[in-house]
Design a protein with these regions (language model features):
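Active-site cores that bind ATP or allylic diphosphates and position pyrophosphate for catalysis
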Residues: 2-391
């Protein structure tokens, strides 16, 4: 089965979108839009997670999908990591509801904070086996896993699949560029390295993604796309709006032409290996050829025991297995530490040279933030610290 286009670049000299075509599901014809709205049987208000998925479908970030997965595709993805056409997918893209009356063939008007964003044309509705989904996608049924807890406690009883007709993107506190907009900013015929994060960027992160441009499998004159997720994450994470403000301040402070910035309205699942695959698919649609992946990417700890749900290299190993089929490459993140003698170097080099390693734990950092104590510049950018203190 042929899963990908054989060409390595599109007409603009960039990696082609996943499946070969960047989908744009936004309807511009006002008559068609009004007709779809008039034929909608139901009106559902989207949760923030739902709204993120609707937006990513509309702009083509989930290409080649043209809507929420139906039952057959859902089952195929959770069991095989592939849709029914054989394309790799890390996690199912589904719409949830408690409405018992909705049936195939009907249309649902989707709103977000009362804004009419899309119509979902239902072709499939089912009651999923959430225990099976949790076990296959997250490796556990424990409610101590944030996504498993979300599936059981937040999602509705039913899943709904069907074509999405987009009207307008959700109005957010932070602007998120579409794949088409990001692609227009990228250089032709050069590697584009994606850096994913869900927290404010500190010095170690900066060193990590700038060092990635020097990796053996990254060509010269390449760029890095810093592409943080600004949607829902874990309960104790910093709010998306605050994270966005730290990124904007840092973008101005760094002002490096090798670094491109965009923000992703994605809802984190903390699914470890499967989420690494999902992130790579999305970043390919945004024009990235490489993906930085480090220890315990998209991992999480049990809320009761504090134990990790995934091994430190599970995500990295799984991503490496999928990379060729995705026409992408992974860039392992180095374990960087700060030394008095030489600044940021690898932990292995610091140990070999017997250099003194400077450390500041997350707990200590937050304490200094709260108490207004000085934070060393080797650890955090002043602009980022200022935003966090104001918030």
């Amino acid at each position: 089965m042929e899963l990908q286009q054989k060409t390595k670049t599109d007409n603009n000299g960039l990696i082609p979108p996943y499946g070969g075509e960047l989908k744009n599901l936004i309807i511009k014809d006002e008559n068609l839009k009004n007709d779809l709205i008039s034929k909608a049987t139901y009106e559902f208000e989207c949760s923030e997670r739902n709204a993120c998925d609707v937006e990513l479908l509309m702009v083509g970030a989930f290409s080649p999908l043209e809507g929420f997965m139906d039952e057959n595709n859902y089952n195929s993805v959770i069991k095989n990591n592939r849709n029914t056409n054989g394309l790799l997918f890390g996690l199912p893209i589904v719409f949830d509801s408690n409405n018992e009356q909705v049936k195939a063939g009907e249309k649902i008007l989707l709103t977000y904070k009362k804004q009419k964003i899309a119509v979902l044309e239902v072709n499939s509705k089912w009651e999923p086996d959430k225990s099976l989904e949790a076990e296959l996608c997250y490796g556990t049924n424990s409610l101590d896993h944030p996504a498993v807890k979300m599936i059981f406690n937040e999602r509705g009883r039913f899943y709904i699949g069907g074509r999405v007709y987009g009207f307008e993107l959700p109005i957010r506190e932070f602007p998120c560029k579409t794949p088409e907009e990001v692609r227009s900013t990228l250089p032709s015929n050069h590697d584009v390295v994606a850096f994913q994060c869900r927290n404010p960027i500190h010095r170690a992160h900066y060193e990590l993604f700038t060092n990635a441009l020097l990796s053996d499998n990254v060509s010269s004159n390449s760029v890095v796309l810093v592409h943080p997720t600004c949607g829902p994450t874990q309960q104790d994470d910093i709010p998306g709006k605050v994270r966005y403000l730290t990124y904007k301040e840092l973008e101005e402070e760094i002002s490096d032409e090798r670094i491109k910035w965009a923000f992703l309205p994605y809802s984190m699942h903390m699914a470890g290996p499967r989420e690494a695959l999902q992130h790579m698919i999305i970043r390919r649609n945004y024009g990235c050829t490489h993906f930085i992946i480090g220890r315990d990417m998209a991992g999480c700890k049990s809320s009761s025991t504090g134990e990790d749900f995934y091994g430190p290299y599970d995500a990295q190993n799984f991503a490496n297995k999928c990379a060729d089929e995705l026409m992408m490459q992974t860039v392992p993140s180095k374990n960087l530490v700060y030394t008095k003698e030489k600044g940021y170097i690898t932990a292995e080099e610091a140990k070999e040279l017997n250099y003194e390693i400077m450390k500041l734990s997350g707990t200590e950092f937050r304490k200094k933030l709260r108490n207004g104590e000085p934070i060393p510049e080797w650890f955090a950018f002043k602009s980022v610290v200022d935003v966090l203190r104001r918030s």
